Amino acid sequence: MGVSYIPVARADELTPGGMKEVDLGGRQVLLAFVGGKYFAFSRQCPHEEADLKTAGQLLDGGKIRCNNHSYCYDLSSGECTLPKGAAPLTVLPAEERGEEICIRLEW
């Protein structure tokens, strides 16, 4: 299995509680900095495809709520925590490497 780290932002571009849209090969991904951790996830809510850039609200504990219908997702696992059992959010591993934030891709 191979691993690549794709730089998507500089570490100083995100403030605590902030989100930034990044393009990952034509796919729109959001990058967030919550609780000292970086998270990368799909821009679209899996419930009804709301744009989480505008409808999403970052919550303590590394979660995001889609304000259209109050669905909540864990940004580490993608699990829908409210309501339980709904379709998960697509998440990608993100980490700080030097002065850059990178998304880790495995194949």
Name every feature range the model reports, one short phrase each.
Residues 19-107:
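Rieske [2Fe-2S] iron-sulfur-binding domain
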